[in-house]
Amino acid sequence: MDTQRKYDILEIRDNALKPVYAREILESLPDWFGNKESLEEYVKGVCDLPFWAALDGEKKCLGFFSVRIHYGHTGDIYVCGVRPECHRMGVGKALYGQAERFFLEKGCKYAMVETLSEKADYAPYEKTRLFYNSVGFEPLITLTEMWDENNPCLIMVKPLAL
């Protein structure tokens, strides 16, 4: 375990463990993942995707990132989350750093993420957008037709240095 932080970032290859960690974290974030149908879709979706978890000394999951790659050159943050009590402690940045290293190893030129647009005026997602800005993402476009008009989808992108 890193002596500076109280957790390790581990790649999880066990497809039975990925949904356990994902459910545990996503259920701790009802302001972001309150829609049960979407939550279930994410929990099932992580099984076959690259997945990293932040585990503390007792092997408790503090957060996770699951990603996919489109067209061989665009890394996509499929779903991620960090326990509320661990927000602003570097867990998300450490997890994102691992995901970005993976994207670079796979030859990706860009990273992208879909999140709720500021046009929805929903405070929890303001924190989400600030997080993505802090790791180098920029807004690209808001699509009201992607999810629905009440939940406009903001696509954020980050060019990756190869």
Each PLM stretch: what is its role?
Residues Y132, F137:
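Conserved active-site tyrosine of GNAT-family acetyltransferases
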Residues F103-P124:
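Conserved GNAT acetyl-CoA-binding A-motif
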Residues Y7-Y78, R83, Y96-G97, F102, ...:
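Acetyl-CoA-dependent GNAT
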Residues K93:
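Residues forming the Rossmann-fold NAD(P)(H) cofactor-binding site
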Residues Y125-T128, T142-P152:
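Short glycine/proline-centered loop/turn elements that form peptide/ligand docking sites
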Residues L49, N151-I155:
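Short hydrophobic/aromatic beta-strand or adjacent loop that forms the aromatic wall/cage
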Residues C80-R88, L116-K119:
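A short, internal acetyl-CoA/4′-phosphopantetheine-binding micro-motif in the GNAT/acyltransferase core
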